[in-house]
Amino acid sequence: MTSELWHQCLGYLEDELPAQQFNTWLRPLQAKGSEEELLLFAPNRFVLDWVNEKYIGRINEILSELTSQKAPRISLKIGSITGNSKGQQASKDSAVGATRTTAPSRPVIADVAPSGERNVTVEGAIKHESYLNPTFTFETFVEGKSNQLARAAAMQVADNPGSAYNPLFLYGGVGLGKTHLMQAVGNAIFKKNPNAKILYLHSERFVADMVKALQLNAFNEFKRLYRSVDALLIDDIQFFARKERSQEEFFHTFNALLEGGQQMILTCDRYPKEIDHMEERLKSRFGWGLTVMVEPPELETRVAILMKKAEQANVHLSSESAFFIAQKIRSNVRELEGALKLVIANAHFTGQEITPAFIRECLKDLLALHEKQVSIDNIQRTVAEYYKIRIADILSKRRTRSITRPRQMAMALAKELTNHSLPEIGEAFGGRDHTTVLHACKVMIELQQSDPTLRDDYQNFMRMLTS
């Protein structure tokens, strides 16, 4: 009964809170107990303290509303329902500040090459270079509300590798700075300890190395490479999906590193529990440390990024010009930087001053989609017809999923395709608050990463509304 009560409570919290907050702090909690006590297990001390400080009051309120009897007493503990395996124990110890386990003496496999790249090799059969980009540092990373928590967590890991949050799991859409943050940690560790053994790579590199090792009968060397590092940084972990043999080997690598107190940082385009065709035991382990979402940057952060990049390129970019680009390019940092590079290149070749008018001409093809004038009324009508509901349903206070999802879709499209502010969009959707619109946009971004049907719907709407 207590378990059912907790699931109902989670449903209310998911509706009330922004997706990032819910996924980071509340979704990882596990519950068990009796009629008198609800025991909540947090994966680490950081989550436990944050839930206790920020959410425990609201949890108590919801539980009291859901039961006619006295609400169960809530206790928070670090751990897991499934018990204390070695890996879990290592995770919990690291979460509460245990000191780094001293690993046996092992050969140095990462050093600084003359070019600044970090070369990583395995003797004999397997050899490849996996490097940290020296420009990806915390100093060159522009902080904003969208990435504030992720940056803070990454800096904690850089200061205390292997004992802060292990693994650190960063997720979010493409081009939002996950790789930059991950490599910033590696560069910070390396700066403090030039003898540190850092290995950064894409998940497909791990798969390719494993296949090569099997072909050359060099699997022991493969395992020695990946298990002898001080920090393992793997990008786009979702590419392990459907690769059963790779998942099996990474599972054992994960356990070996965790038990050795070696740091892991993983990135993904979606929340770990939402990765299809990935073993449950792996998805569970991904959540043992700290899971943080990196969101699309808000306008102020986009402007700051542009100004920073222009400064690094020794190019004068007025705040007016930066604001113009930031208003037009809203999808991700990568596209934003690409647009700026195109503008700078055109200015260099033509000798013209960078102004909003010059930018519009340079980016006319890229901005074509954003320049389409689409009304909120047209968006609401198109979405309602597509999902076979009434416009009145979209504007209503109904919260059933069959109405909520189309409403969130329409709000996200309105933000993407119109120049209306969030309060104006909220007002057009039945007098809702701007935070509701912002939450709807976040939900759509996340669902597009995990739900192919919804992603196709969104792309279809974009085509219909801009054609």
Curated annotation (Swiss-Prot):
One of its GO terms (cellular component) is plasma membrane. SMART domains: AAA (SM00382), Bac_DnaA_C (SM00760). Gene3D superfamilies: 1.10.1750.10, 1.10.8.60, 3.30.300.180, P-loop containing nucleotide triphosphate hydrolases. Residues 1-80 are annotated as: Domain I, interacts with DnaA modulators. Residues 80-130 are annotated as: Domain II. Keywords: ATP-binding, Cytoplasm, DNA replication, DNA-binding, Lipid-binding, Nucleotide-binding. It is found in: Cytoplasm. InterPro entries: AAA+_ATPase (IPR003593), Chromosome_initiator_DnaA (IPR001957), Chromosome_initiator_DnaA-like (IPR020591), Chromosome_initiator_DnaA_CS (IPR018312), DnaA_C (IPR013159), DnaA_dom (IPR013317), DnaA_N_dom (IPR024633), DnaA_N_sf (IPR038454). GO terms for biological process: DNA replication initiation; regulation of DNA replication. GO terms for molecular function: ATP binding; ATP hydrolysis activity; DNA replication origin binding; lipid binding. ATP binds at residues 175, 177-179. Residues 348-467 are annotated as: Domain IV, binds dsDNA. Residues 131-347 are annotated as: Domain III, AAA+ region. Transmembrane segments: none annotated. Oligomerizes as a right-handed, spiral filament on DNA at oriC. NCBIfam families: DnaA. Domain I is involved in oligomerization and binding regulators, domain II is flexibile and of varying length in different bacteria, domain III forms the AAA+ region, while domain IV binds dsDNA. Plays an essential role in the initiation and regulation of chromosomal replication. ATP-DnaA binds to the origin of replication (oriC) to initiate formation of the DNA replication initiation complex once per cell cycle. Binds the DnaA box (a 9 base pair repeat at the origin) and separates the double-stranded (ds)DNA. Forms a right-handed helical filament on oriC DNA; dsDNA binds to the exterior of the filament while single-stranded (ss)DNA is stabiized in the filament's interior. Belongs to the DnaA family. This is Chromosomal replication initiator protein DnaA. It comes from Hahella chejuensis (strain KCTC 2396). The lineage of its organism: Bacteria, Pseudomonadati, Pseudomonadota, Gammaproteobacteria, Oceanospirillales. The gene is dnaA.
